[in-house]
């Protein structure tokens, strides 16, 4: 507890250890962690950053890919931003719960959600079957009050019909110890949450801590851009774009498009 480790490689002419520590404390404070086991003022920060391998730099200096790998982008017509509805609703719920911390001081920073839909057809969600929301809360608050308020917040935020929806709010009944104090965190461990919520394949590479030379991030962003434009232009109801790269090579080693249930080389 009360520990942050930052490790990795950098390529920069300037490296300020004190500035990095300041950024870490500010980010933790901005999130809102001020609990006994994880407080921005009391963190022990272990900085293990070091210079990038010159062998890797050889490949990226001329805009080549920083590594090999597969990246996927996905888009569909389920929502106005061409994201799957389940992950879209999860994001809306959690953004609203975080906003409500201003009105309910007992809501603490660690929250997560899961939405289950039923479908009448591909790309046609029928209804919201279940909503799970686990909300970290202060110790002095009654669990039934937590469940009541969180369900009210969700119902106010989600405009879809929730008449037959089953709510699972803090299913264990208590969620006081949260964040890195309760569960060791590592950036990049939740790659499905960071993308499409299980609606699309994933190459395995995380986004966190990477700049544009790392195609795990920039390649995935480009694949999403391509998929979104295929769908938004009316050429498909859903589209998956797969790219692959080789380290040091500028152009993709392969491009694959799968839309509306079939391979679409024409796209």
Residue ranges and their predicted role:
Residues 1-12, 247-251:
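Short, charge-patterned binding micro-sites
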Residues 2-4, 14, 22, 27-176:
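Glycine-rich, mobile lid/loop segments that gate access to catalytic sites or pores
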Residues 8-24, 28, 74, 78-79, ...:
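Glycine-rich and small/hydrophobic secondary-structure elements
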Residues 10, 49-52, 119, 173, ...:
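Acidic, glycine-rich active-site loops and adjacent beta-strand->loop/helix elements
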Residues 14-15, 174-188, 244-267:
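Short glycine/threonine-rich loop-to-helix capping motif typified by GTGT followed
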Residues 40-47, 166-170, 236-246, 252-258:
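Beta-strand segments within the central parallel beta-sheet cores of soluble alpha/beta enzyme folds
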Residues 75, 79-95, 210-234:
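Alpha-helical support elements that line or immediately flank enzyme active sites
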Residues 140-231:
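Glycine-rich anion/phosphate-binding loop at the beta-strand->alpha-helix junction
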